[in-house]
Design a protein with these regions (language model features):
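Gram-negative (and chloroplast) outer-membrane scaffold detector with strong preference
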Residues: 44-141, 180-183
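Outer-membrane beta-barrel biogenesis signature
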Residues: 5, 18-27, 185
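Residues that define the transmembrane beta-barrel architecture of outer-membrane proteins
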Residues: 21-23, 34-38, 73-79, 117-123, ...
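Extracytoplasmic loops and strand-loop junctions of Gram-negative outer membrane beta-barrel proteins
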Residues: 22-25, 64-66, 108-112, 160-166
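Sec-dependent N-terminal signal peptides
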Residues: 4-16
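Predominantly the C-terminal beta-signal and adjacent terminal strand-loop region
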Residues: 134-185
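Solvent-exposed loop/turn segments connecting transmembrane beta-strands
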Residues: 24-41, 59, 90
Length: 185
């Protein structure tokens, strides 16, 4: 599945023309608050109203690893490819998005000791607004919802290994709260 996403991203990015103001790179500041999730998104314009996007998020951190009562993690690697429609003009004003997303995750110990790990794949729909700060700099605000299927294993705590549930199920959850710094070149 990862190879398919990487191939789709590569084909999408090389198929667009590379003139001025057609490329951007951004990072979502909200992701850093969620236990230090590193993230990047690249975007290429394919016309006046359409951009194609590829993004990745990685969080390898485990906090308080030596203390089972305090251990918490939001470990993940997430990859997405998608498209944005800009009613006015690319990288300016309102936008609507759709994307395919894959995530391998291990979360637990944050709000309770319950921990879940697994793989999730699905589609996301979102929208937002890009505020132009400078000719080459935007602040991008947005929100998206993600639905799909996940295979998972639930544990009683982050470090005990006691399985409480496992299986496969459909999900529909908030995906991304976006306050991103975007550089356009």
């Amino acid at each position: 599945m990862k190879k398919i996403l990487i191939l789709m991203t590569f084909i999408t990015l090389i198929s667009s023309n590379a003139s001025a103001q057609d490329w951007s790179i951004s990072t979502n500041l909200v992701d850093y608050i969620t236990l230090g999730t590193l993230n990047v998104e690249g975007s290429a314009a394919t016309g006046r109203h359409i951009t194609v996007n590829a993004s990745a998020r990685v969080n390898p951190w485990t906090f308080h690893k030596g203390d089972p009562a305090k251990q918490m993690q939001n470990r993940q690697q997430t990859y997405a490819v998608g498209i944005r429609y800009w009613p006015w003009h690319i990288y300016s004003g309102w936008w609507f998005s759709g994307m395919a997303q894959y995530e391998e995750y291990n979360r637990g110990g944050i709000f309770s000791q319950a921990t879940e790990e697994g793989d999730a794949f699905g589609l996301s729909l979102g929208g937002g607004y890009s505020l132009m700060i400078h000719e080459n700099l935007n602040i991008d605000f947005g929100l998206s919802l993600w639905g799909g299927q996940k295979t998972y294993i639930s544990y009683a705590c982050p470090s005990c290994g006691r399985i409480t549930n496992k299986g496969s199920k459909w999900f529909f959850i908030p995906n991304e709260l976006r306050v991103a710094i975007q550089y356009i070149f």
